[in-house]
């Protein structure tokens, strides 16, 4: 093979590599799993949905999501048979994608009322949903809630399943004074995976800012 032919072959191979579709279209598939059980009153539900919309509108979060083509979905959960994928998987390829998703998140209507708290069942549904996510390098489930279980299966089986799938489970615990067993402790001990973390909002009013910091940590892959 002549030098010119060799250069041509290398150039064609390089061009093909650059033009080939990436195996992972996105960096992170992030499923937001929101507690809407009986302990969440209507005003607290509004705080959660509005807080999610505000977090997604944060300029730093928006820049990372577009640059990394993050895939988002929202699941709401309560009792053992009560889980609903409210917003299906959406790849954030441009700012308009995120703006539309944030608007839809803020307008979500509550699917369940007067129901129990079953995070173990919620995790099972979340894992089923994340199996249908676009191909991404990382898959993360972000569980938020203000109570410990009062029904449904233990979360341990779902946590083992998540670790086998390579899915990270993180938690956002909403706690109020006098709420009994700290939700943060339950999330740390029973819910999150070994590579996961928990952040705590000390009231529902602190939810939006805590969620913003949590999502930023998840998509920026900040360690510690």
Per-region residue spans from a language model:
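Bacterial N-terminal signal peptides that target proteins for export
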Residues: 1-11
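N-terminal signal peptide c-region/cleavage motif recognized by signal peptidases
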Residues: 20-21
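Von Willebrand factor
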Residues: 26-88, 91-92, 99-144, 170-183, ...
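Extracytoplasmic/secreted envelope proteins and their assembly/folding machinery
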Residues: 45-53, 57, 69-71, 87, ...
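Exposed acidic/Ser/Thr-rich ligand/metal-binding surfaces
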Residues: 114-165, 216, 220, 224
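VWA/integrin I-like adhesion module and closely mimicked acidic/polar interface patches used
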Residues: 148-189
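C-terminal "exit" segments of structured domains
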Residues: 199-224
